[in-house]
Regions:
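Hydrophobic faces of well-ordered beta-strands that scaffold small-molecule active sites
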Residues: 71-74, 89-93, 124-131
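A conserved active-site cap/scaffold subdomain adjacent to cofactor or substrate pockets
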Residues: 74-105
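An alpha-helical appendage that flanks or caps ligand/catalytic pockets
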Residues: 2-62, 99-205
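A local structural motif
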Residues: 63-70
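A generic secondary-structure micro-motif detector
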Residues: 70-71, 193
Length: 206
């Protein structure tokens, strides 16, 4: 609810000359705020002229794009993917495997198509982040960047666990600690573009 209301406020600020908002989490402008500024003459556009309280506020400068810049939301679960599509928000995905991404791409396509009442092409409105390191050989990529990538993912997965790295329906063997399986070989085949130019190109086409 907080995110949805934040988005509502943002769109108002971008698209209206002066705006007000009274919601569950936010109220703009602050109630009964008296406005007095020598360089900003009073105006009924944004003030109650009887008591000099603000009725509306504005932002400057306004966005260059009309009605506003494209909005992108980082998503993971199907619920957030469908919510973004239903609100005509582009999405950004990161860690999931190709098999998992295909399900997520389809979910976004279907929800966006339903919202716009047309067939939205698969992949439209979706951005994908992938970690990449290109080298002359596969061994060189591993030697120069592999350890750093694993350490980075250990930091990320400390809270998240390994669920985002798994294929749909995949079961991982039980381990003493939740990140015992997290190594270069585990990551590389799932979502890393580390290797020769040819390898990276093939993975992109995948």
């Amino acid at each position: 609810r907080l995110f949805a209301e934040t988005l509502e406020v943002l769109k108002k600020a971008w698209t209206e000359k002066f705006f007000s908002h009274a919601g569950e989490f936010y109220t703009y402008p602050h109630p009964n705020h008296v406005w007095q500024h020598d360089m900003s003459p009073p105006s009924e556009e944004f003030m109650n002229m009887k008591d000099n309280t603000l009725k509306k506020i504005s932002i400057v400068p306004k966005p260059y794009q009309s009605p506003h810049p494209p909005i992108h939301q980082v998503v993971d679960g199907i619920r957030s993917i469908e919510w973004a599509a239903q609100n005509e928000i582009n999405v950004i995905m990161w860690i999931p495997t190709v098999k998992a991404l295909k399900i997520k791409f389809e979910a976004y396509k279907n929800a966006r198509s339903e919202k716009e009442k047309k067939n939205v092409p698969l992949g439209e409105g979706v951005s994908l982040v992938r970690d990449m390191f290109v080298a002359d050989t596969m061994e060189e990529a591993r030697e120069k960047a592999g350890e750093h990538m694993v350490n980075y993912m250990k930091w990320v997965c400390h809270w998240r666990g390994l669920g985002n790295h798994m294929d749909p329906g995949e079961d991982l063997p039980e381990t003493k600690r939740k990140l015992d399986l997290l190594n270069y070989d585990f990551l590389h085949k799932r979502n890393m573009l580390f290797g020769t130019p040819e390898y990276v190109i093939d993975k992109i086409h995948e």
